């Protein structure tokens, strides 16, 4: 399971780092001597000890002031927390951008009216993007496998656009009511955003569930209490059924598209040459 090398030359250390990088790995290298400088310089993340040589410390990205490698897990976890929280928050903001662009193009192409008032988008943005991402960013987030922003954002954006466009088609051909169109679109979009929150911030712990379900309650409560301020109207029985169907179908579609995109990404990683580093190790052993 493990390979241990003794008396490795600086050139061999550098070659080992390059072999791992050629397979798509992000490589960290630790060292404290002059003979480690080549590998430290080549690595994606170089770590030196405070008691090491000046050459190693000058070339390193990280210098452990206590010369204790046990500090690294805490350092890595803090980095993961920052990166993961930024990535999940960026996913939610990107959903809004992608959804707005796709819906704008559809309304221009089909000559329809944009189905949202500015104040209605303010409610959705506050309850589904601004407040929850701020509160959830305070949480410790130490996941090892980071999701890509696009994989998180695109399924929700596509689902929201599809559901809103379906409501637009029904209202245009059956109801001919702008107020009913706006109301149905706001409810469907807000619900889909909440479903996206569950996907982006999965797995859900108690804190995350409290924030997400709390935002759901605030969103629908605000839609009822501030109905006139938000330019929302009432829905008839047929539109209620349509909204209910879309709300039920949307989370499933988000999950299906997410799994599909992750499968494509996983297959792209499998195409990398898996034997290059193994061949290099065998060469060193000889």
Regions found by a protein language model. Name each.
Residues 215-222, 247-251:
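Transmembrane alpha-helices
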Residues 1-35, 41-44, 86, 108, ...:
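Cytosolic catalytic headpiece
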Residues 35-36, 133:
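Residues immediately C-terminal
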Residues 1-28, 43, 48-208, 217-228:
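Membrane-embedded transport module
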């Amino acid at each position: 399971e493990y390979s241990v090398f003794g008396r490795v030359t600086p050139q061999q250390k550098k070659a080992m780092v390059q072999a791992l990088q050629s397979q798509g790995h992000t490589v960290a290298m630790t060292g404290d001597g002059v003979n480690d400088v080549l590998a430290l310089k080549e690595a994606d993340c170089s770590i030196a000890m405070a008691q090491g040589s000046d050459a190693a410390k000058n070339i390193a990205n990280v210098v452990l002031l206590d010369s204790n490698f046990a500090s690294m897990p805490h350092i890595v976890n803090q980095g993961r927390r920052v990166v993961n929280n930024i990535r999940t928050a960026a996913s939610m903001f990107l959903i809004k951008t992608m959804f707005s662009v796709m819906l704008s193009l559809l309304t221009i192409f089909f000559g329809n009216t944009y189905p949202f008032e500015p104040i209605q988008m303010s409610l959705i943005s506050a309850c589904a993007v601004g407040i929850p991402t701020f509160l959830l960013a305070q949480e410790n987030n130490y996941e090892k496998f980071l999701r890509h922003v696009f994989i998180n954002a695109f399924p929700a954006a596509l689902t929201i656009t599809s559901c809103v466009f379906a409501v637009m088609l029904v209202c245009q051909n059956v109801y001919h009511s702008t107020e009913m169109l706006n109301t149905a679109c706001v409810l469907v979009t807000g619900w889909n955003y909440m479903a996206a929150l569950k996907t982006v911030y999965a797995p859900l712990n108690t804190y995350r569930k409290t924030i997400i379900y709390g935002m759901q309650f605030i969103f629908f409560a605000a839609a009822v209490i501030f109905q006139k301020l938000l330019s929302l109207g009432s829905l008839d029985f047929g539109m209620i059924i349509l909204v209910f169907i879309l709300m039920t179908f949307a989370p499933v579609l988000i999950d299906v598209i997410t799994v599909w995109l992750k499968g494509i990404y996983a297959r792209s990683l499998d195409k990398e040459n898996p034997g290059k580093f193994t061949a290099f190790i065998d060469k060193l052993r000889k």
